[in-house]
Amino acid sequence: MSGTVKLHRVLPTSPEKVFRAFTDAAAMAQWLPPYGFTATVHELDAREGGRHRASFTNFTTGNSHAFGGEYLEFSPGKRLRYTDRFDDPDMPGEMVVTVEFEAVPMGTELRIEQAGIPDMIPVSACYLGWQESLDKLSKLVTPEIPD
């Protein structure tokens, strides 16, 4: 049986800026990997039907794992839905990630659901990884730095 995590955050910035962080390769390489990992974005065709592919590398051990998928829904500033599948045959199955961006008086309400987490990945580890990633996302999108 696969697992699901749900996360919720409010970020004090616009939905468009947060959405851009989910669809820009350089931004994703900065915020998406949990602490202790680096990321390489190998492919990012950010549109409905487009594909994405990335890998995370454990900075301590140097071990990497790659994953990729397809964008199922792409509504700028509002909603993303995409698949993720690991290259590792020991982690079969397809995960579906749904991200909703809603303008609220204090900025952007962000709701994330990741479903279909392979059995060999503890859901609590996945949840912790997302929390770390969202901390990094907040630090990327919150500052308003003029040109």
Predicted regions: what they are:
Residues 1-38:
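Hydrophobic ligand-binding cavity/cleft-lining segments
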Residues 2-8, 15, 39, 51, ...:
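Intrinsic-disorder/low-complexity, polar/charged segments enriched in Ser/Thr/Lys/Arg/Asp/Glu/Gln
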Residues 8, 43, 70, 98-100:
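Short, surface-exposed charged micro-motifs
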Residues 18, 28, 52, 71, ...:
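Hydrophobic pocket/interface hotspot
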Residues 23, 134-142:
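Short amphipathic alpha-helical signal-transduction/dimerization elements
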Residues 40-83:
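Glycine-rich portal/gate segments that line the openings of hydrophobic small-molecule binding cavities
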Residues 41, 140-147:
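Short, highly charged C-terminal tails/helix-capping segments
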Residues 81-131:
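Beta-strand/loop substructures that line and gate deep hydrophobic ligand-binding cavities in soluble
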